[in-house]
């Protein structure tokens, strides 16, 4: 692996010990979403910064990432999360499987003739967890995204024995997507500990859109038995200055409310 660039495809554990520690009492949360491109990394990053400001030593994992440019790893989700930590850990300790193709993890793994090892991810997670007072694990896509012929993201959450935060859009159709996601989590015995409503794209401020968004938010709050945070409006700064955008989002009252909720009601 040259110049700190990630070793695409092949997992490497060279930067961490593979001696399993005892189960940690430290706070750990799985970050999932109703879909891809909803803003998991954005919300994870904001929570990392918010909790760091409260004095917590925060760790992150993005065990599987697809669509990663090996020439610009710093622009990947993993690279951006890595940049928030001090000192920055090795890329490979955050992301065990990095694929260049922007397709589903199982399709990527098959294209490269490998199998994503959920048990191996769990081993790496427990080590990272022991080193931090708070740890976030970010998934890929939604909860039923296949990782291997036998395991989905949901199976990974079960294997890690973590509660989950679900990031959802506020656009039309999100009520159905979110309720299906919650049903899938509950069906596997996974505890959803929060819903974050996020606008990952600029909004069209016409009357129809505003009505759709307002009604979607209202119905999610009405139908959810899980605490709802947000909505978080699209952050234009994120596209031009990612770090500054994340600092701004970390100061958002709803991110603070979510961070406090996690600390005070440790799942």
Residue ranges, per PLM feature:
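Extreme N-terminal starter segment of soluble prokaryotic enzymes
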Residues: 24-29
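N-terminal phosphate/diphosphate-binding loop that engages ATP/GTP or pyrophosphate donors
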Residues: 42-115
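Conserved glycine(s) of the Walker
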Residues: 38-39
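Short internal beta-strands
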Residues: 62, 165-168, 193-199
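Inter-motif core of Ras-like GTPase G domains
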Residues: 149-170
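Phosphate-binding/switch loop-helix module in NTP-utilizing enzymes
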Residues: 105-147
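C-terminal lobe/tail of nucleotide-utilizing enzymes
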Residues: 183-267
């Amino acid at each position: 692996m040259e110049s700190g660039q990630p070793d695409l495809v092949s997992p490497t554990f060279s930067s961490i010990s593979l001696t399993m520690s005892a189960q940690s009492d430290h706070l750990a949360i799985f970050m999932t979403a109703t879909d891809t491109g909803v803003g998991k990394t954005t919300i994870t990053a904001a929570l990392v910064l918010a909790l760091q400001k409260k004095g917590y030593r925060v760790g992150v994992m993005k065990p599987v990432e697809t669509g990663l440019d090996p020439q610009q790893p710093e622009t990947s989700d993993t690279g951006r999360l890595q940049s928030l930590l001090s000192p920055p850990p090795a890329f490979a300790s955050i992301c065990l499987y990095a694929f260049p193709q922007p397709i589903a993890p199982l399709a990527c793994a098959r294209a490269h003739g490998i199998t994503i090892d959920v048990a191996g991810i769990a081993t790496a997670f427990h080590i990272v967890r022991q080193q931090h007072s708070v740890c976030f694990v970010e998934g890929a896509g939604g909860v039923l995204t296949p990782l291997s012929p036998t395991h989905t993201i949901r199976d990974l959450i079960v294997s890690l024995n973590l509660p989950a935060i679900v990031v959802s859009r506020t656009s039309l159709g999100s009520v159905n997507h979110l309720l299906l996601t919650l049903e899938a989590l509950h069906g596997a015995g996974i505890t959803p500990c929060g819903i974050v409503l996020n606008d990952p794209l600029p909004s069209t401020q016409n009357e129809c859109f505003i009505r759709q968004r307002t009604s979607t938010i209202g119905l999610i709050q009405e139908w959810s038995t899980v605490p709802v945070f947000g909505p978080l409006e699209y952050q234009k700064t994120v596209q031009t200055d990612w770090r500054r955008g994340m600092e701004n989002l970390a100061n958002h009252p709803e991110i603070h409310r979510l961070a406090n909720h996690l600390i005070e009601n440790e799942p």
